[in-house]
Amino acid sequence: MTHSQDLFDRARDVIPGGVNSPVRAFGSVGGTPRMMVKAAGPYVTDADGVEYVDLVNSWGPAILGHARPEVVQAVQDAAALGLGFGATTPAETELAELVTDRVRVAGVDGSPDRRPIEKLRLVSTGTEATMTAIRLARGFTGRDLLVKFAGHYHGHSDSLLAEAGSGVATLALPGSAGIPEAIAAQTIVVPYNDLDAVRAVIAEHGPRIAAVITEAAAANMGVVPPLPGFTAELARIAHDNGSLLISDEVLTGFRVHPAGYWGLDNAGLAADHPDAWTPDLVTYGKVIGGGLPVAALGGRADVMDHLAPLGPVYQAGTLSGNPVAVAAGLTTLRLADAGVYRALDIAADILIYAVELAFDRAGLAYSVQRAGSLFSFTFGTPPEHGITDYATVQAQETWRYPAFFHSMLDQGVSLPPSVFEAWFVSAAMDEASLDRVIRALPAAARAAAAATPPA
């Protein structure tokens, strides 16, 4: 028995399923989760001393790699001054200023820069950020209904688990037990990338729809970018109805571009370009905390000022803006310069090419989807129109992934334990770590090709 197995058995005695987030349990790939005890640069090390190239990267935050010395030092310095005060600190303002300044695209032909984030509220988790965004949208508009897309994951609050991605997709759950029907009925789910479906819902329920929420680029059912012009038209539809557009950048924010997916999608576009779009509210998480629990909700000042203490929409948190966590986030964002994003894109380019080469040589049918440096793949022949929604993602040959995953793991590469999750590269990946992944791919591809569907 490995030490990881022994530790996992011990965990299951006192923690439901042995994990504190379901996808970590290896439920869709089988086997025993590795108990990780150390992370540095592009590597993680398990309780048995085995080192892995990490393509999970804490599910996104570790864009610089693990335990970057400057981030560790900032955390130590902040902790030495106090772990938390229950009061506002200057660092919270610095982080809010950094985000409002960073999330912009340059103006075109002399026009001013476009900045969708006028004010920011810090919270601790992405779930809190999206939950607050929904409450704020309802409070601002005086309406009750929410429109979301099938396969999009916005955290585990009651309003947002219907036909969600991430762990809900991994476990093939319709949502979650424990959500009252009355609450579920306030969320209308439509197919992703289907504007006609959105228009139909608006036509039927328009006066009651407070907001449309969308992942800026879907990345919790695998990576599925919006079709060209989709989000711009979605914004027009929402705004024409008096509804808000909420862009969930918990996963994509500050990972795929210095200004998040909004910056990637709007770069070089004038404000009046037909493909340009501006959300009313944006949620952030993961990278903004640099590996510690920080998330945020930002957007239009007139909407944000409806939050207490200025407005009637209540939100609070004992650990919101925790100084140690904010120090990690501030330092990470300050270090995440243009060179970091070039490194992320180059690493993604190299690995995507290597995956395609290995899959082609193994005779696998597949497709690769990408948004910036985020990418994933689906097994099986994709439909003619490509992978564009939750239904096409779910139709893939998911049964090939466990064999692929465990072959990579056995060769020292840690991948997400679900085919419905993105691969996360880091700027710490060097020639040696990339080479280990590349060398592991051919055998893993052959294992996937040899896999058979369950009886």
UniProtKB/Swiss-Prot annotation:
Domain of life: Bacteria
Compartment annotation: Cytoplasm
Record pathway: Porphyrin-containing compound metabolism; protoporphyrin-IX biosynthesis; 5-aminolevulinate from L-glutamyl-tRNA(Glu): step 2/2
Molecular functions (GO terms): glutamate-1-semialdehyde 2,1-aminomutase activity; pyridoxal phosphate binding; transaminase activity
Assembly with partners or alone: Homodimer.
Modified residues (N6-(pyridoxal phosphate)lysine): 286
SUPFAM superfamilies: PLP-dependent transferases
Catalytic activity entry: (S)-4-amino-5-oxopentanoate = 5-aminolevulinate
Upper classification of the organism: Bacteria, Bacillati, Actinomycetota, Actinomycetes, Micrococcales
UniProt name for this protein: Glutamate-1-semialdehyde 2,1-aminomutase
Keywords (A to Z) from UniProt: Cytoplasm, Isomerase, Porphyrin biosynthesis, Pyridoxal phosphate
